[in-house]
């Protein structure tokens, strides 16, 4: 009995250490690559959602989507948690500078959207993800994202 508990405890420790090897995210946040994400199924306008994200964690903003793989990851998170078929992402032109920008300052390299009004939502459909620009005053669920603190590997 004692050995069984010790072995099970050891396996639990290994499982938790492997889970955190990608990014060191707080409880309730999910990791992908070097970022942490959290989907919120409450409806806010774009400005309120961005402010809410910034209050959650230092460096947190509405999610920037920098690749199709990241877009798929965020969409899969949202499918599990959001009842609405769309959600805010961090792309906008709210400062009317004739250039679209991510709220976290990331470069706009990857895009999957149709240009229109000032803020961008991700439309969630099984097997298909696209972006649409809509009025920033619309209220939608949203995803926050921040750069995770990585654990430095122990020296050998």
Curated annotation (Swiss-Prot):
Keywords: Disulfide bond, Hemostasis impairing toxin, Lectin, Secreted, Signal, Toxin. It is found in: Secreted. The keyword Disulfide bond applies. Expressed by the venom gland. It holds the Pfam family Lectin_C. Residues 1-23 form the signal peptide. InterPro entries: C-type_lectin-like, C-type_lectin-like/link_sf, C-type_lectin/snaclec_domain, C-type_lectin_CS, CTDL_fold. Disulfide bonds join 25-36, 53-144, 119-136. Its main location: secreted. Belongs to the snaclec family. Calcium is required for ligand binding. Interferes with one step of hemostasis (modulation of platelet aggregation, or coagulation cascade, for example). Heterodimer of subunits A and B; disulfide-linked. This is Snaclec subunit B. It comes from Philodryas olfersii.
